[in-house]
Every structure is written in structure tokens, then in C-alpha cells.
């Protein structure tokens, strides 16, 4: 049986997917569980950053570091290490042991969650692989994500180490942006693979819809990168007005480009860092809304049109949340919500992009399994 090219005529449960294998339901559930854990990592990492806790653990011990201080002597040792950091000497000299413990638990919890994510990835992965439940493409994608996850741990320590250098009271913004963007790439990869393991075939969306749908996750990732630079440099505290920036829509060039060499302005000039994040947000929302209108006209009534509308709605809501965060001078709850909601936008955009490509049909029907997760939004057709 072949799917028609009209996305409004094909039911998502009409034909089995060619790439589907027995047990893929468990694989799909595992991938979505990992995605949830990565979002939790981003949330805890955001809270760690916003509470200034990220430099409270001064060593990278991937194995033995899982055990926290267990008695007063252990806590004294860890506190002495922290008191030797520039952050303590410059910013936190008045902090006591109880205050240090609060900082420590945030960072320790973030690292512990990273270890848990690693175990939840590698143990089931080995089991699924041994049982032959992973096709070649899925296996390749998972191996790539596993390597990226290991690299992410190293990036995290490199980021922390940058904040322990003389004169530093926080991590380097560029390294923080890299850490956040890598986590986002891992999340997008997990969701992409999960959506691709749906049990039923799906006709691709019209080409014009498909092209823009695949562009949207890339735009969201760039915006997350720019947001990481804002977060790392605290550029969100420089201009707390909107739509203007302290009375002007665009700061003068002498303000935006006052550093030499020129390229450093895009990383270290707080005015330009915030301006770029604002400007790119407008671009993402404009593209998402235009895409939703395009999909509604080109594939009216299809699931692709519904998903496009969902991406546009989430992107617009995220921009509104970002504006509120800015106007409120970045309180912890708003900054954290803005960071986590960015992951929701990325997830929706990634699912939309993957399903817009379609899922090829098998030669003949072979059993049935109910789709779970966001790919169930495929509904009818593409």
C-alpha cells in the first residue's frame, strides 16, 4: 500500500512505517524519558546559574564526586576550597557555612542529575543494541548523541574552570552559551529520533512547508545560543525597557561596537549582546507566524498546519515571557521560566520538522501500536 501525496487523505494509522521494529515503543518511551531528564538538567542548571552556585564545587571528579560531604570535617574541607576562589574573595566574603551549603547543593544536584542522565542513556542503549532493536540510522544517531553527551560533561567542567581563573566571579559567557546550546542540541536530537520511531507511516508535508519547518529548529538553536550569551554576561540587566532600549529602538553604533577587535563586540559588548537577542527573537517569531500562515494555506486541515500553529504560538509566548523577564529585571523565577520554556519551543519545532519530512511506509502491514509522545500530534496526514 502506498501513501497518497495529499496529506489530508492519509490517516496516521493507515500503514506501518518501514523503519519500525518490534520494541520501538519501548525505545520511543526511553527517548522521551531522556528528553524530560535533559529539560530537568537545563532547569537545574539555570537555577544553579541564577543563584550563583556554579563555582561552589572547585574540582571535577566524575566518579568520586557523586558522594557529597558527609560530616562537618568534609564540609570544612569543601568550604576552604571555595574560600580560595576569586568569587568568594570578591563577592561572597560574608557568606557562612550554611550559605555555602545552599550553593553547594545546587551545583552538586546539577552534576548528580548529569550522571543519572548518563546512566539512563547508556544502560538501556546497551540492552536495546544487544537485542537488535536499533536500526542502523537510529543506532548511528544514538552513538552520536552519546558522544555529544560525554563532550557536554567536559564542556561543563571547562566552563566551571573558566570561572575559577584569577579575577573571575562567574563563568565565561561564551562557554556558558556553548554548554547551554550543546544541551539543547542533545535535546533536539533525542526528540528527532523519538519522533522518527513512530509505528505508522506518515506522508511528507508539501515541500514549501517542509523546508521552513526544518529551518525553524536551527533558528531556535541560534536564539538559545544568543540567550546563553545574555545569561552568561548578565546583559539582561543592562536595558530593562521595551520595545526601546533606554529611549532608543537601536543604540548608536558607538555603543554597540565600542570594542576592538570588532568581533569581540558580539561576545563582550553587553549592549550588542542584548540587542542581538532581541532582534533574533523578532526574526524567529516572524518566521514562525509566516510559516503557520503558509501551512494553513498550503496544507489546510492537516496536522502539519496544526503543528506550525503550535510552534508559532509557543515562540510568541516565549518572546512575551522574555519581555516580562526583562522588564522585571530578571527575577529568578522569570529567568528560569524563560530558559525552560525555550526548550519547549525547541521540542515543538523539532517534532514539527521531523514529522514534516514524513515517515516512509512499509511494504505490508505488520501489527499495531499506538503512538505516544508529541508525534501523536501528527493526527491526520502530514
Swiss-Prot record:
Q: Which residues bind heme?
A: 277, 338
Give the reaction(s) catalysed: Fe(II)-heme o + 2 A + H2O = Fe(II)-heme a + 2 AH2
Major site of localization recorded for this protein:
membrane
**Pathway in which this enzyme or protein is active:** Porphyrin-containing compound metabolism; heme A biosynthesis; heme A from heme O: step 1/1
What are the EC numbers?
Answer: 1.17.99.9
Q: Does the keyword Chaperone apply?
A: no
Q: Which keywords does UniProt give here? A: Cell membrane, Heme biosynthesis, Iron, Membrane, Metal-binding, Oxidoreductase, Transmembrane, Transmembrane helix
- Tell me yes or no: is Transcription regulation among this UniProt entry's keywords: no
Q: What class of enzyme is it?
A: oxidoreductase
Name the coenzymes or cofactors required. Answer: heme b
Q: How does it sit in the membrane?
A: Multi-pass membrane protein
Q: Which GO terms describe its molecular function?
A: metal ion binding; oxidoreductase activity, acting on NAD(P)H, heme protein as acceptor
- Give the UniProt entry's GO cellular component terms: plasma membrane
Q: Which GO terms describe its biological process?
A: heme A biosynthetic process
Q: How does it assemble?
A: Interacts with CtaB.
Record's function text: Catalyzes the conversion of heme O to heme A by two successive hydroxylations of the methyl group at C8. The first hydroxylation forms heme I, the second hydroxylation results in an unstable dihydroxymethyl group, which spontaneously dehydrates, resulting in the formyl group of heme A.
Q: Which family does it belong to?
A: Belongs to the COX15/CtaA family. Type 2 subfamily.
Record-given protein name:
Heme A synthase
Q: Which gene underlies this protein? A: ctaA
Amino acid at each position: 500500500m502506498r501513501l497518497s501525496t495529499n496529506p489530508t487523505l492519509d490517516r496516521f494509522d493507515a500503514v506501518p512505517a518501514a523503519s519500525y521494529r518490534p520494541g520501538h515503543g519501548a525505545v520511543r518511551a526511553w527517548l522521551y524519558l531522556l528528553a524530560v531528564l535533559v529539560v530537568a538538567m537545563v532547569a537545574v542548571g539555570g537555577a544553579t546559574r541564577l543563584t550563583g552556585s556554579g563555582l561552589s564545587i572547585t574540582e571535577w571528579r566524575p566518579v568520586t564526586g557523586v558522594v557529597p560531604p558527609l560530616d562537618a570535617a568534609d564540609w570544612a574541607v569543601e568550604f576552604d576550597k571555595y574560600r580560595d576562589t576569586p568569587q568568594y574573595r570578591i563577592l561572597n566574603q560574608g557568606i557562612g557555612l550554611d550559605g555555602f551549603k545552599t550553593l553547594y547543593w545546587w551545583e552538586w544536584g546539577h552534576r548528580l542529575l548529569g550522571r543519572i542522565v548518563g546512566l539512563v542513556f547508556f544502560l538501556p542503549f546497551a540492552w536495546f543494541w544487544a537485542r537488535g532493536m536499533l536500526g542502523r540510522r537510529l543506532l548511528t544517531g544514538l552513538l552520536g548523541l552519546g558522544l555529544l553527551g560525554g563532550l557536554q560533561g567536559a564542556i561543563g567542567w571547562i566552563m566551571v574552570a573558566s570561572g575559577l581563573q584569577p579575577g573571575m566571579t562567574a563563568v565565561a559567557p561564551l562557554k556558558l552559551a556553548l554548554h547551554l546550546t550543546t544541551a539543547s542540541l542533545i535535546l533536539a536530537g533525542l526528540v528527532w529520533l523519538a519522533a522518527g520511531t513512530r509505528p505508522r507511516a506518515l506522508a511528507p508535508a508539501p515541500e514549501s512547508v517542509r523546508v521552513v519547518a526544518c529551518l525553524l529548529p536551527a533558528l531556535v538553536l541560534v536564539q538559545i545560543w544568543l540567550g546563553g550569551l545574555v545569561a552568561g554576561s548578565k546583559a539582561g540587566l543592562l536595558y530593562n525597557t521595551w520595545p526601546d532600549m533606554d529611549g532608543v529602538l537601536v543604540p548608536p553604533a558607538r555603543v554597540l561596537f565600542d570594542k576592538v577587535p570588532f568581533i569581540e563586540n558580539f561576545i563582550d559588548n553587553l549592549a550588542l549582546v542584548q540587542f542581538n537577542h532581541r532582534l533574533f527573537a523578532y526574526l524567529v517569531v516572524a518566521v514562525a507566524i509566516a510559516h503557520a500562515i503558509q501551512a494553513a494555506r498550503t496544507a489546510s486541515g492537516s496536522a502539519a498546519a496544526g503543528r506550525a500553529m503550535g510552534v508559532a504560538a509557543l515562540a510568541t509566548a516565549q518572546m512575551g515571557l522574555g519581555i516580562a523577564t526583562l522588564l522585571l529585571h530578571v527575577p529568578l523565577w522569570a529567568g528560569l521560566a524563560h530558559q525552560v520554556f525555550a526548550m519547549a519551543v525547541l521540542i515543538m519545532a523539532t517534532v514539527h520538522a521531523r514529522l514534516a519530512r514524513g515517515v516512509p511506509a512499509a511494504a505490508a502491514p505488520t501489527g499495531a501500536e499506538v503512538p505516544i509522545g508529541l508525534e501523536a500530534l501528527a493526527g491526520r496526514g502530514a
